């Protein structure tokens, strides 16, 4: 019996829990996702490459492991797409550039490897602007991705296909990239959650920018999760965090007494005005910080030229 369409919009945490409890199988969730893609993607144009034979094989293997009583990861059997700026072993990875239209990597970007090791199943790739260089999702190979809420609008960019896929229930979560808003803009435009991590805490090799491979760490780009809940972001970021190497973050534990912390609140700026509704949400967040006893400075600004 097919599972409810509503399951396609559940959080990753909810979907993974249901699979482990036997409420539905990984294969059933995958087939629901494929059904959603076949129904919605012709207009949405978010998912641009798929390997469904491999995805089905991996979903069946995931179900067999669970049936055998194997210890499984927190993302066991979860079907996902990945932004086409990241290398995925055995699945075409182009960066939105015609020069790489036949590029099929033999290895995964470390963040892709991390979520796969946690049990996720990569079924395909999502659209983006050429070399991730725009605030929309269009390129000469795959065309334009539209906003799932209004096809006359853009989904944002550069992780526009990723955000649209998550919002429309075509992927349980996504992995985006961000320099100047490429996770945050599309997450906002499509009504989902996105997080740009601090520099260095998530490995950025395997990112496709003007070349295949991405063997060096990006100097300004970061990679982060996109999902349908804040709880999912927490889980996914923990899985993506750098585990080894010279750039492993050594962050101090949060102090027990938060009143020793000082927060700079930069809520608006004449060079970048924001909507009143956004301002009210930010102001409420600052008020919550003040209510916990933190010191808030509303005048502090970074030492940069406007």
Model-predicted regions and their roles:
Residues 15-21, 99-103, 221-228:
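Short, well-ordered beta-strand elements within core beta-sheets of diverse protein domains
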Residues 26-30, 60, 248, 276-302:
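Acyltransferase
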Residues 52-75, 82, 101-105, 115, ...:
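Flexible, acidic active-site loops/lids enriched in D/E/S/T/G that coordinate Mg2+ and/or position polar
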Residues 107-237:
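Short glycine/serine-rich loop segments
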Residues 62-78, 232, 254-264:
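Immediate post-signal peptide segment of exported/extracytoplasmic ligand-binding proteins
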